[in-house]
From Swiss-Prot:
Organism: Escherichia coli O9:H4 (strain HS)
Single GO term (MF): galactokinase activity
Cell compartments where the protein resides: Cytoplasm
GO biological process, one term: galactose metabolic process
Residues that bind ATP: G124, A125, G126, L127, S128, S129, S130
E.C. number: 2.7.1.6
GO cellular component: cytosol
Protein name: Galactokinase
Family statement: Belongs to the GHMP kinase family. GalK subfamily.
Active-site residues, Swiss-Prot/TrEMBL: D174
Site (Transition state stabilizer): R28
Alphabetical list of InterPro entries matching this protein: Galactokinase (IPR000705), Galactokinase_bac (IPR022963), Galactokinase_CS (IPR019741), GalKase_N (IPR019539), GHMP_kinase_C_dom (IPR013750), GHMP_kinase_C_sf (IPR036554), GHMP_kinase_N_dom (IPR006204), GHMP_knse_ATP-bd_CS (IPR006203)
Length: 382
């Protein structure tokens, strides 16, 4: 049963009438450009064919009812006429409440809604299950009430909800790619202007995501520390963000910076340059150059930004040994566990899967999860 069928059927059973719309918003994987988003830099993600799906209908009152199919059909109810505050017990409900609350601040011309939510974006893996939920909820209200909001505004609203209501300091990339993804393309995103450029993916190349299953937590983890170190670096150069610092400027005065901050800054500056170059390499189908750029990105995350863990480095090495320069591989996401992403010629996918199955668990004691994905369309009706 598809997520659409599942949520529609649950909706009819729970609420006693049929849903009028079903909306999806995808998860994402970032091909290159890690921790650059909150430094006003560039990222190169693609939406993937794992998504959050919501079957929904407008109500004729001011009540919101939300059922979470993936959490034992837990039900949250709240009113649009009372202050929206955090739910005492359900963390998932806070993503919904946060999106609705921030949408009210943007455009308060919507009424109540019934929703049933289900998703297959792996949680806690760095594939943006939370952003896909935020964008899906925003798109539901936009579609049901014909709100004059575009994808970028729905994405910004989701980011605000996560930063201010949920309390996780995320950048804008995750929500933006979920809202604006394009089938068979990656999206080069300028995180300052929010300008996007669709970059066609080479034919015959699979986007493979391998979850290390090494558990990580982003809220309250090292993520916020890295963000502070980057802000310290930008202040040193008297710039609003590291986006505005050149590698030449950095090299001239790197010795004056705190050594740890210097390493963090160097990662951001070199990663931005790699990301812009990767977009043109991908468009030209130059997998050899893409392979080099992804390898440099991983080394920079490991040595300068220090966000990889031994399990992730092991996964990258196993994949690299199989694909050589025929494809690229690197850690993706916030770090400290999570996933690696690889661009792999389709004919090499079985060999990679076999090598990982034979070696990863033997070396780490953890069993990986392997996903072969397609670059997919952003949020909309399904």
């Amino acid at each position: 049963m598809s997520l659409k069928e599942k949520t529609q059927s649950l909706f009819a059973n729970a609420f006693g009438y049929p849903a009028t719309h079903t909306i999806q918003a995808p998860g994402r994987v970032n091909l290159i450009g890690e921790h650059t988003d909150y430094n006003d830099g560039f990222v190169l993600p693609c939406a993937i064919d794992y998504q959050t799906v919501i079957s929904c209908a407008p109500r004729d009152d001011r009540k919101v009812r939300v059922m979470a199919a993936d959490y034992e059909n837990q039900l949250d109810e709240f009113s649009l006429d009372a202050p929206i505050v955090a739910h005492e017990n359900y963390q998932w409900a806070n993503y919904v409440r946060g999106v609705v609350k921030h949408l009210q601040l943007r455009n308060n011309s919507f009424g109540g809604v019934d929703m049933v939510i289900s998703g297959n974006v792996p949680q806690g893996a760095g594939l943006s299950s939370s952003a896909s939920l935020e964008v899906a909820v925003g798109t539901v209200l936009q579609q049901l009430y014909h709100l004059p909001l575009d994808g970028a505004q729905i994405a910004l609203n989701g980011q605000e909800a996560e930063n201010q209501f949920v309390g996780c300091n995320c950048g804008i990339m995750d929500q933006l790619i979920s809202a604006l993804g394009k089938k068979d393309h990656a999206l080069l995103i300028d995180c300052r202007s929010l300008g996007t450029k669709a970059v066609s993916m080479p034919k015959g190349v699979a986007v493979v995501i391998i979850n290390s299953n090494f558990k990580r937590t982003l809220v309250g983890s090292e993520y916020n520390t890295r963000r502070e170190q980057c802000e310290t670096g930008a202040r040193f150069f008297q710039q609003p963000a590291l986006r505005d610092v050149t590698i030449e400027e950095f090299n001239a005065v790197a010795h004056e910076l705190d050594p740890i901050v210097a390493k963090r800054v160097r990662h951001i500056l070199t990663e931005n340059a790699r990301t812009v170059e990767a977009a043109s390499a991908l468009e030209q189908g130059d997998l050899k150059r893409m392979s080099e750029l992804m390898a440099e990105s991983h080394a920079s995350m490991r040595d300068d930004f220090e966000i990889t863990v031994p399990q992730i480095d092991t996964l990258v090495e196993i994949v690299k040994a199989v694909i050589g320069d025929k494809g690229g591989v690197r850690m993706t996401g916030g770090g400290f566990g999570g996933c690696i992403v690889a661009l792999i010629p389709e004919e090499l996918v079985p060999a990679v899967q076999q090598a990982v199955a034979e070696q990863y668990e033997a070396k780490t004691g953890i069993k990986e999860t392997f996903y072969v994905c397609k670059p997919s369309q952003g949020a909309g009706q399904c």
